[in-house]
A protein has these predicted regions:
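Regulatory loop-to-helix N-cap segments in sensory/regulatory domains
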Residues: 23, 36, 51-53, 59-82, ...
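A short, aliphatic-rich beta-strand micro-motif
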Residues: 38-47, 54
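Output-coupling edge of small sensory domains
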Residues: 43, 48, 59-61, 342
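Regulatory sensory and allosteric helical modules in signal-transduction proteins
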Residues: 1-36, 264, 282-283, 289-290, ...
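Histidine- and acidic-residue-rich, metal-dependent catalytic cores
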Residues: 106-433
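Short alpha-helical interdomain "coupling" segment at the junction between an upstream regulatory sensor module
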Residues: 89-108
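Amphipathic alpha-helical "output/dimerization" segments
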Residues: 51, 67-92, 159, 346, ...
Length: 433
């Protein structure tokens, strides 16, 4: 303690005759173990800012000829102080590396926190995808069957993949929140279905006025009001979006758009739905238009641009490739670069499966409910058959029951059903060892 507080070396010739320091603990240790602790040399270790970061302590200098314990000489103290200086440099370098890694990961967390705050619906995605990616990658390293049985990762490889997973959607920091969180087809900053509802109320009022004025009969009024309510219910349902919109439903939206007229604040007669509203309400699947889908897809371009602009150290040089490939397909029809399976690393293909499975099972999206295990695996299996995801990784995902491990941590009990693997598209039993 004295060496640390005084920043001075302490050279004790013999602990048993030394009066300036309390060596009762040392003597008790010697008595218990039979060891003889006599000469001590304690040297403080200082970093580049002259701060004490540790001590180097040597015990029992020995005479090279007789082997007897003797005090540490001045030359030995000088040598020890030189070694302590070198040790301090090495320790400082290690601490600096640890601090830089901690700072770097804090910046990653900062970016993800900003994305989470923008979009609470997809907030957990940035954390769940890297977790599932690592689960799958670790399962691949453990598998002893199939084409991937020789795949291995070191701890550095795992760290690199984890960092890539955490950064895989960093480009979303610029994506407009009303596009990311678009829960219904007519939603922009707010859901425009309320405007459509208001127009229906205007149409109903006009019909009631027409009946009062004798332009239509009471029976005609009742029939037309029923049609208005039917059309309103249809548009409300259509606005939600879904897996697929039928041709007849698209035609009905277009028919409704011109079936009713309403007068705007300027006194102009307008079609019931604007061209933009028709375009949005006739989105075939989901809630995004082609233009909005392009805005969403742009996040991966930006992710790659951001990551490739960074001066990565040698052990992290693959981060842009791993993070930037999770929207590619095995048949080369993905985006942004149209890479094929052979042009992608196993790690990037792992992240592709993780990104899809997380999205299928996520229960915090505004536009859909989280799917069950059976539903999610069935969709993923069809993607295997359609050359969307890597077939070998899908097999490992199923064989090693990675989906079960993930489900226990991140899925609701009602989503975790009993999976009959024989009914999952693309499933093949594992080969014999």
């Amino acid at each position: 303690a004295y060496a640390v507080h005084s920043s001075k070396s302490v050279n004790i010739a013999d602990a048993y005759t030394e009066e300036g320091f309390d060596f009762s603990g040392t003597k008790a240790f010697d008595k218990k173990t039979g060891y003889g602790s006599h000469s001590f040399l304690t040297v403080p270790m200082k970093n580049h800012e002259n701060e004490i970061i540790g001590v180097l302590q040597l015990i029992n200098a020995k005479n090279r000829v007789t082997g007897e314990v003797q005090p540490f000489s001045a030359s030995e103290q000088y040598l020890a102080e030189s070694l302590a200086s070198q040790a301090a440099i090495a320790l400082t370098n290690r601490l600096l590396i640890n601090h830089l890694e901690a700072l770097f990961e804090s910046f990653i967390s900062l970016i993800n926190a900003a994305i989470d705050d923008k979009s609470p619906y997809t907030g957990g995605h940035c954390n769940r995808v890297p977790e599932l990616t690592m689960m799958l990658a670790d399962a691949v390293t453990k598998t002893r069957v199939g084409p991937l049985k020789d795949f291995k990762m070191t701890e550095r490889d795992r760290y690199e993949l984890r960092i890539a997973g955490l950064l895989h959607d960093c480009g979303k920091i610029t994506t407009p929140v009303h596009v990311v969180d678009k829960a219904t087809k007519l939603e922009t900053i707010y859901d425009r279905i309320a405007l459509v509802d208001t127009r229906f109320e205007v149409v109903k009022r006009d019909l009631q006025i027409a009946e009062l004025r004798g332009f239509i009969t009471e029976i005609e009024l009742a029939a037309q009001l029923k049609q208005v309510e039917d059309d309103r219910a249809f548009l409300r349902h259509t606005n939600i979006g879904g897996e697929f919109m039928r041709d007849e439903d698209v035609a009905r939206v277009r028919q409704i758009s011109t079936s009713y007229k309403w007068t705007d604040a300027s006194g102009n007669d307008c079609d019931f739905l604007s061209e933009d509203e028709v375009k949005n309400l006739t989105i075939r699947a989901g809630t995004l238009t082609t233009e909005e889908r392009q805005v969403i897809n742009h996040h991966i371009d930006l992710t790659i641009d951001m990551l490739e602009a960074l001066p990565w150290p040698k052990h992290l040089t693959n981060v842009p490739e791993y993070a930037g490939g999770h929207h590619e397909r095995m048949d080369g029809k993905g985006y942004p670069r149209g890479l094929t399976r052979e042009q992608m690393s196993v790690q990037a293909r792992c992240m592709g499966i993780a990104d899809i499975f997380e999205a299928l099972t996520a229960k915090d999206r505004p536009y859909k409910k989280g799917k069950t295990l059976t539903e999610s695996l069935s969709i993923l299996g069809k993607m295997k058959l359609g050359q969307h995801v890597d077939p070998d990784l899908f097999d490992v995902f199923v064989w090693e029951r990675v989906y079960e491990t993930y489900a226990k941590q991140y899925m609701s009990p009602e989503q975790i059903d009993d999976v009959d693997l024989s009914k999952i598209p693309g499933y093949v039993p594992p080969p014999a060892h």
